[in-house]
């Protein structure tokens, strides 16, 4: 005889999950509204979930919490760690003394909370939520593109020349070595006698 009113228990809140609101993951059931990252509380789906010891995370938080750590294992811009590679025999650079800069913005708010830096491409103010640092300078996310082809860049995929940023392909075409045997790939080399 069937048990009426029963259902699986939610893996997050422990209450009964009915079929219309059920999300299944790793053999467990969740309410749609409970299927959230344990750290940032972002909504998850089958393409964004990562599981560790029966806890669910978005891929970004999972990588920060359980991913590889140490020299050479960055998870992209903004998640750099402080391992300087001393165990590998790499000698750390001596720390440079802090030199305060003069902020030309004289508003009391800007002096107290920091004025907005200027984007290296368009010259407009760049605020923290939209700022990317590349080649040591601030950029808007939309301005952080190759100066030649307009391709969107990441801090690890850019090259810089004379204050401008380029994708590796455009940099090689425009500023790389020139002459016989360069720039066409190994299949285009010709042996002339």
Curated annotation (Swiss-Prot):
InterPro entries associated with the record: Znf_LIM
Signal peptide positions (record): none
SUPFAM superfamilies noted in UniProt: Glucocorticoid receptor-like (DNA-binding domain) (SSF57716)
Chain positions found as N6-succinyllysine: 137
CDD domains in the cross-refs: LIM1_CRP2, LIM2_CRP2
Primary residence: nucleus
Pfam families referenced in this protein's UniProt entry, alphabetically: LIM (PF00412)
Oligomeric and partner information: Interacts with KAT14. The LIM domain 1 is necessary and sufficient for this interaction. Interacts with GLRX3.
Protein name: Cysteine and glycine-rich protein 2
Natural source organism: Mus musculus (Mouse)
